[in-house]
Amino acid sequence: MTYLVTFSPLEPYTFGTDQSFTYEGADKTGQESYLAASNQLPEQTMLLGALRYMALQKAGLLHTDFSYTPAEQERIRACIGPESFRFQKPDQSFGVIHALSPLFLVNREKQTVLIPNPFHNRASKSGYQPMQLGAPIRCGEGEIRLPLAEEYKAKKGYASGFLELGSRDVYSELFQKHLITGNQEVMEEDEREQAFFRRERYALDKDYAFAVLAETAADALPTDCVVYMGVKRAAFRARVCPAEAFPAFQGQAAESPSALLKGLVEAELNTGDAWYYALSDLIAPPGFRLGSFSIVEEKSLRNIETKLGETRLLHRRRRSPIRWHLIRAGSVFSGQAPMLEKNAAAESIGYNVICNLGG
């Protein structure tokens, strides 16, 4: 069954990046800094982790001391899968959690859906106005197309924020950034020392929540609970309801949560020339080619991996030794869809979702 799961921040949060200070006992990445930068949005891997936490909570399998009998460990494996998500393992099982859609936002009061604003949208406050391109031009790299003279202004840059489906209003100020400054104790060559730090935190507008569509076993998740995500384990209120109970998804059917959200977006924005829009982050293969014209943001990710049998907190979690390079949601490609790296497990949790807009 497909459910709508929303996560409302109860306090400012920090969603970690490679630019962060380390914590005692953790593997170093070479990117540690006195500044802990934060992303505005949670990763798909983090949302999967939150849903697994909720499934364990519903099943009565959360122990604060992480101590489980062999029988309980078998129940945990059946409930949420045998191991942490890994990009390098395309065949994985997540127990009662079958599939996720890409992240989006909802306005809980208006009951509307918001998606990352396509980067080629020229409307700054309201509307969807795809950028118009000129005739093809031959060059050393092949055939390219450029925006018409008035279609792109370098001083303004390309589109950002979130686009509300239905009204097509653009929201660019849903997040507020806060900085925490202070000193913390760190271990340097077996000695404790004081170290200066600054940590970024974000607050999401109170009328909005992070959201995913999740296909799970029936009644596998609690309908209303608190989960913890990010650095310092910020609290989020998680609420679950059948997807069909939310107005945008009423009467809609699809083979997967990603297909359900994708169909909604394509029906709303299918106008003009052929553009391909990254509704989710994309996994780009080596030698990835961008085509005749595109507007793309890149990002890197090291997800957190957990060892089920480890009882000590510092040894239970580690950063992935592999840094993955992704194309950020909101990126757009003209003319033809990009070739992506196939990864069944990543696609099942909401990666590699591209919408065909127009054409």
List each language-model region with its residue ranges.
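Conserved active-site/ligand-binding neighborhood in enzyme cores
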Residues: 1-359
